[in-house]
Every structure is written in structure tokens, then in C-alpha cells.
């Protein structure tokens, strides 16, 4: 098992950090850490953004480091070309131990309030919640979804609003597609959902999600596995799909098929520049477009499945 990792560090303007982090996450296939965001706060209103962020990616020490550095530098050069006048420093490489890597991202993951009542708390923290808080304990491990990223926050905020708007006696079925850490599925249960299904194509993400479900005593209340969307039985009153824009468009027919009449569909993981691509992909007479929410460079869209004529 690898105990030493190559850490590649890039300093970049804050408004491009998410784009770089997404690229490095796909390139490394392991982990990415974004720093210089003051998350030592209980409300997103208190978060302070710095002008420059530091994005760190981790690779096995067996990797061809020169080849990886060249790929990353080429990506940074393309970013600079798209933003005239932008100067991006060359990446810095260092070697870290596994335990150092773990400490690095933990230092930047603090309790976070999302929406009106949701409080996301890492397992190593114990903040005093307000009486009506819905506390979700989380150890994200290598899976995406701490609640700090814009795409996850958008989903959580919209989920809370949708669930609060449901009739009191209704316990809706909820699907969390691309569950990552399991945070959306856990929030759905705590917000009053009945059947909750969480799926991800990444077995490691499913394992992390199951561990987080156990931390919150929700193992028996969420079906969590790698079942493909097309193989899931039944329909859902709420579907949360926080995945890449291109995948959302590809899965549009299946998502609509799994959404019950009158059900709500939340699409996230969409860069603002991909918004029209997704809007076109979901231009279906069975769906009513409801709204678009924006945070930073990211958007989330809400649709409702209309009754058949």
C-alpha cells in the first residue's frame, strides 16, 4: 500500500480554483485539497474568500511526475490564454506521508451551516448546535461532498426547501444520484423522506457513504450501492443529481423516467458555462422548468415533472 504521495501545489485566482480542482481531481483519481478559504464559521455568510487559492493534488509516488507536471502546466497555460493578463505560477511538487495528507484536508474542514437548519459537522469536531439544528456527522474520506463546495451546498439548500414545502403527512421517496460522501441522502432522511436511495458508480464513494450513514445511525434507512440508474426499481418524488453536466444530459431520459408525476428534479454539478447545454438537454414537455440557483462559478437547476396530458 502506498504510504508516500506526490503533492502538486498550484496557486490560482479564486474564481478559477474550482475549475482547476475539478481537472486535478479527474487527473489524479485520488484527492484534491483547496486551501485559503476561511471555513472556520457556522454560516456561509461568514465565509471569507481570498483572492488567491491554493489547490493541491495528490499522486502515487510511482507516477511519472515529469509527465504529470507537463500535463498540469499545459492546462494552466490554456487557462492563462483564456484570461488575458492572468499570470499563474508554475506548480510546486513535494513528497508527503499519508498521515500528512489526511491532516491537510482535515485542517480545512470545519463545521458548516447550510440552509436554515442543516449543520454539517466533521467527526473530530463538536460544536454546540442550536436546538432545531439537523446535525449531520461526516468523515468524507476520499469521496466528494463535504457541504463546503458550491454544488453540494446548492443541492442541500434546495432539498431543504423542497422537503419543507411537502405536505406534512407525505414521506417522499428520494434518489441521490452520485452520492459521494452520502451527505445529501443523510439530509433527506433527517428532513423527513421515506424511501431514500443513494447510488454512485465509484465503489470507494459507496463505502465512504456507508460509513457516514453508520456514523449517523442511518444505515437501515438508506439503500446505498452501485446500482445503475436504469436498474433502480420504482419512481422517486425527489431526485438529486450532482454530477457532471455532460452526464446529466446523457442520463436525462432515465432521470425523467425515474421521476414521479409531480416530482422535483434538482440538477447540480454544472459550471455556469455549461448551463445552456443542460437546459437544452432537459427541454422536455414532461418537465416544467422552475428555477436556477447560482453560487460562484456553479449553477443548479430545478424541474418538476408535469402531469401527462
UniProtKB/Swiss-Prot annotation:
Q: Which GO terms describe its molecular function?
A: protein-lysine N-methyltransferase activity
The family database entries (InterPro entries) matched by this protein are listed as: Ribosomal_L11_MeTrfase_PrmA, Ribosomal_PrmA_MeTrfase, SAM-dependent_MTases_sf
The places in or outside the cell where this protein is found are: Cytoplasm
Which residues are involved in binding S-adenosyl-L-methionine?
152, 178, 200, 242
What task does this protein carry out?
Methylates ribosomal protein L11.
What name is this protein filed under? Ribosomal protein L11 methyltransferase
For this UniProt record, give its keywords in alphabetical order, as a comma-separated list: Cytoplasm, Methyltransferase, S-adenosyl-L-methionine, Transferase
Does this entry carry the keyword S-adenosyl-L-methionine? Answer: yes
What the entry lists under PANTHER family is as follows: ELECTRON TRANSFER FLAVOPROTEIN BETA SUBUNIT LYSINE METHYLTRANSFERASE
Q: Which Pfam families match?
A: PrmA
Has the keyword Chloroplast been applied to this entry? no
**GN (gene name):** prmA
Q: Which reaction does it catalyse?
A: L-lysyl-[protein] + 3 S-adenosyl-L-methionine = N(6),N(6),N(6)-trimethyl-L-lysyl-[protein] + 3 S-adenosyl-L-homocysteine + 3 H(+)
GO terms in the biological process aspect are: methylation
> What family is this?
Belongs to the methyltransferase superfamily. PrmA family.
Enzyme Commission numbers on file: 2.1.1.-
Q: What GO cellular component term, any one, is given?
A: cytoplasm
Q: Give the source's domain of life in one word.
A: Bacteria
Amino acid at each position: 500500500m502506498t504510504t508516500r504521495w506526490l503533492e502538486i501545489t498550484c496557486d490560482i485566482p479564486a474564481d478559477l480554483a474550482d475549475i482547476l480542482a475539478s481537472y486535478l481531481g479527474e487527473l489524479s483519481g485520488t484527492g484534491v485539497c483547496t486551501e485559503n478559504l476561511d471555513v472556520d464559521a457556522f454560516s456561509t455568510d461568514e465565509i471569507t474568500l481570498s483572492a488567491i487559492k491554493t489547490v493541491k493534488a495528490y499522486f502515487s509516488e510511482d507516477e511519472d511526475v515529469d509527465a504529470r507536471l507537463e500535463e498540469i502546466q499545459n492546462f494552466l497555460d490554456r487557462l492563462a490564454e483564456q484570461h488575458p493578463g492572468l499570470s499563474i505560477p508554475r506548480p510546486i511538487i513535494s513528497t508527503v506521508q499519508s498521515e500528512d495528507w489526511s491532516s491537510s484536508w482535515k485542517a480545512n474542514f470545519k463545521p458548516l451551516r447550510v440552509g436554515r437548519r442543516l449543520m454539517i459537522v466533521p467527526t473530530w469536531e463538536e460544536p454546540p448546535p442550536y436546538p432545531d439544528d439537523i446535525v449531520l456527522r461526516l468523515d468524507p474520506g476520499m469521496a466528494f461532498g463535504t457541504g463546503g463546495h458550491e454544488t453540494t451546498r446548492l443541492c442541500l439548500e434546495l432539498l431543504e426547501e423542497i422537503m419543507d414545502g411537502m405536505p406534512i403527512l407525505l414521506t417522499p421517496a428520494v434518489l441521490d444520484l452520485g452520492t459521494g460522501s452520502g451527505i445529501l441522502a443523510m439530509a433527506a432522511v433527517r428532513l423527513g423522506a421515506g424511501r431514500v436511495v443513494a447510488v454512485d458508480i465509484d465503489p470507494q464513494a459507496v463505502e465512504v457513504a456507508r460509513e457516514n450513514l453508520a456514523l449517523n445511525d442511518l444505515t437501515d434507512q438508506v439503500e446505498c450501492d452501485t446500482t445503475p440508474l436504469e436498474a433502480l426499481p420504482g419512481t422517486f418524488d425527489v431526485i438529486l443529481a450532482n454530477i457532471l453536466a455532460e452526464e446529466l444530459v446523457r442520463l436525462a431520459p432515465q432521470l425523467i423516467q425515474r421521476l414521479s408525476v409531480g416530482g422535483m428534479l434538482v440538477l447540480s454539478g454544472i459550471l455556469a458555462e455549461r448551463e445552456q447545454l443542460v437546459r437544452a438537454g432537459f427541454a422536455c414537455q414532461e418537465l416544467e422548468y422552475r428555477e436556477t440557483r447560482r453560487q460562484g462559478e456553479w449553477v443548479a437547476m430545478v424541474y418538476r415533472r408535469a402531469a401527462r396530458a
